[in-house]
Design a protein with these regions (language model features):
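N-terminal amphipathic, basic helical "cap/leader" segment at the start of enzyme domains
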Residues: 1-81, 175-177
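Small-aliphatic-rich amphipathic alpha-helix that forms the alpha element of a beta-alpha
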Residues: 33, 83, 90-136
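Short, charged/polar surface micro-motifs in flexible loops or helix N-caps
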Residues: 53-58, 89-91, 158
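Active-site-flanking beta-strand signature of metal-NTP-handling nucleotidyl enzymes
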Residues: 82-86, 152
């Protein structure tokens, strides 16, 4: 798949087959994460945590549903793998750099999943719930001084990707000449 086609085809997938993510596909997704730009070259201050534990994902699902006041919902969408992006906590002047870098890492993983025909979805609610549930956060065993910044669910799906027309004016544009 070419880059522009992947961009036009990418969408949030919320249904998964129940199959595990293959080691080969995970390796490709992690390689895409490592290809992302990181502000000021601070790659050594970024960290990825791959969660394949069904028990952890169910606990995160429950915590997220409670936090969102939607008990009975499944905000992890039964995804088989969640990849958390964390970074070393920075002084406030640099925090935006790490947040932006984590977003780029997450987006690279989503685009790689799209290219591989896998489903992927940003899991912002899950990120918030895990970040605010000490028992779940501790299970991630993040490096000392690191905080969660992004979460991506990824796995096999029966859904297909179709390129869509992207309106050129979805985001307003201004300029200075």
């Amino acid at each position: 798949m070419e880059t522009l086609n992947a961009l036009a085809s990418r969408r949030s997938v919320r249904t998964y087959t129940g199959q595990s993510l293959s080691a080969s596909d995970l390796e490709k997704i992690l390689k895409a994460a490592n290809a992302a730009p990181v502000g000021m070259g601070l790659y050594d201050q970024m960290h990825l945590t791959v969660v394949n534990s069904h028990d952890f994902i169910v606990s995160a699902d429950t915590a997220t549903a409670v936090m969102m006041r939607t008990e009975g919902a499944h905000p992890t969408y039964n995804v088989p793998t969640i990849i958390f992006v964390s970074a070393k906590k920075q002084n406030p002047m640099l925090s935006g750099v790490m947040i932006s870098s984590a977003a780029m890492v997450a987006h690279n993983m989503v685009l790689a999943a799209t290219d591989l025909g896998l489903g992927a979805c940003y899991l912002w609610g899950v990120l918030a719930a895990v970040s605010n549930t000490p028992a779940l956060l501790a299970k991630l065993n993040l490096p000392e001084g690191y905080g969660l910044l992004a979460a991506v669910g990824v796995g096999p799906t029966a859904e297909t990707y179709e390129a869509r027309e992207i309106p050129a004016d979805r985001i307003s544009v201004s300029g200075i000449e």
